[in-house]
């Protein structure tokens, strides 16, 4: 899922005293997080340096090391910030009581496509991007990324349980397995859409997943 709004900042963890000439502390922290998310959702972790983030955020180097020990520490903070941002995005779609459960899932995929379209399909999902780079990333990233994905899967599984309860989804489905399959496929569709700079892979995935629902519920 791409970055579509200004993400919330993670809790600040200052390391040293505020550097001279630094902007307001909270603004500097938010600027660093936002610049980091924008660059990493588009370019990935390995190809983006700290200096590039500092330039985009327009903060001095001292401000970066006031909050983060190093680039790896910054990367973990970005995962945390993205997780918080994404939880709110899922709330917006999954908690919409005016829609049936599966319609809420379709709302989420439409919101995701609209977010990618706003950036010309050049920004992808931070979690998916980092997962692709995991072989070159610090080991701490693995547990953080898996934890985020498992949270998304649990929330989606609950949505499928609601769909079963109202007769919208066949009871033959295992909600947990179906949620895992959804996120494996959706992350792949996001990656392909970013590669091709077009929404077609997203449409292909949602059509296929939707047909699976319809076929099973009509049996």
Swiss-Prot record:
Disruption phenotype: Loss of repression of its operon.
UniProt DNA-binding region: 49-68
Annotated HTH tetR-type domain residues: 26-86
Record-linked PROSITE patterns: HTH_TETR_2
Keyword Transcription regulation attached: yes
Gene Ontology MF term list: DNA binding
Taxonomic superkingdom: Bacteria
Stated induction or repression of this protein's expression: Strongly induced by acrylate, the operon product (20-fold), and dimethylsulfoniopropionate, the operon substrate (DMSP, 10-fold). Part of the acuR-acuI-dddL operon.
UniProt keyword annotation of Ligase present: no
Chain spans, region Disordered: 1-25
Classification via InterPro entries: Homeodomain-like_sf, HTH_TetR, Tet_transcr_reg_TetR-rel_C_sf, TetR_C
Keywords in alphabetical order: DNA-binding, Repressor, Transcription, Transcription regulation
Function description: A transcriptional repressor for its operon. Probably binds to 2 operator sequences in the promoter.
Protein name: Transcriptional regulator AcuR
PANTHER family: HTH-TYPE TRANSCRIPTIONAL REPRESSOR NEMR (PTHR47506:SF6), TRANSCRIPTIONAL REGULATORY PROTEIN (PTHR47506)
Cited Gene3D superfamilies: Tetracycline Repressor, domain 2
A Pfam match: TetR_C_13
